[in-house]
Swiss-Prot record:
Site (Important to generate the dianion): R104
CDD domains according to UniProt: cupin_ARD
Pathway entry: Amino-acid biosynthesis; L-methionine biosynthesis via salvage pathway; L-methionine from S-methyl-5-thio-alpha-D-ribose 1-phosphate: step 5/6
Native source organism of the sequence: Synechococcus sp. (strain WH7803)
The protein's name in its UniProt record: Acireductone dioxygenase
GO molecular function, one term: iron ion binding
PANTHER family named in the record: ACIREDUCTONE DIOXYGENASE (PTHR23418:SF0)
Keyword annotations from UniProtKB, A to Z: Amino-acid biosynthesis, Dioxygenase, Iron, Metal-binding, Methionine biosynthesis, Nickel, Oxidoreductase
Residues noted as binding Fe(2+) in the record, renumbered to the chain: H96, H98, E102, H140
EC number: 1.13.11.54, 1.13.11.53
Residues the entry annotates as binding Ni(2+): H96, H98, E102, H140
Record's keyword annotation contains Metal-binding: yes
Length: 180
């Protein structure tokens, strides 16, 4: 289930938490973050490749592309046995920004986006059928968990794909990670 928890940037207990997707959408929109749910699709086959995944979600991809300038789309799929899972997790766990929006449609599993906005940290657990759009320049990090299980369609306006500018702020170390 999707979840939003809002913390002071100092850490500690959340000052707000909800599992209600309408409240999640509202609270995020107040902070310039787009969040929505897409219609459910059939489960993705274990042997599905990127082309199969993108074809299955073509309608949603076109709808999201129409919301912004996202000509490049790909799919990333992580499973607990992925050989590079620990290295990739560590890379995404460091606070960073992008020169472009970070837009993700989760089509399988879940992941945790942590958004550092002003004096707050918002932890958004995204589940299957959630999409989130984090505006360019937003300080954030992402946790896929120790045993990652997710597939997300990624939307880019930069043909080079995922390009991070790391802040070197250790803030992510003060906050909880995705619970497996």
């Amino acid at each position: 289930m999707s979840e939003l928890s809002i913390y002071s940037e100092q850490g500690g207990e959340p000052v707000f938490s909800t599992l209600d997707s309408a409240r999640i959408q509202h609270e995020l929109s107040l902070r310039g973050i787009a969040f929505d749910r897409c219609a459910s699709k059939a489960e993705i086959a274990l042997d599905a490749d990127q082309a199969d995944i993108l074809s299955t979600y073509a309608e949603e991809i076109h709808r999201i592309q129409a919301l912004g300038d996202y000509p490049t789309v790909d799919a990333i799929r992580m499973k607990p046995d992925h050989p590079d899972r620990q290295a990739l997790r560590q890379k995404f766990l460091s606070e960073h920004t992008h020169a472009e929006d970070e837009v993700r449609l989760f089509v399988e599993g879940r992941g945790l986006f942590c958004l550092h906005i002003k004096s707050e940290v918002l932890q958004v657990t995204c589940e299957t059928n959630d999409w989130i759009s984090v505006p360019a320049g937003t300080r954030h990090w992402f946790d896929m968990g120790e045993k990652p299980y997710f597939c997300a369609i990624r939307f880019f306006n930069n043909p080079n794909g995922w390009v991070a500018n790391f802040t070197n702020d250790p803030i992510a170390e003060r906050f909880s990670k995705l619970r497996d």
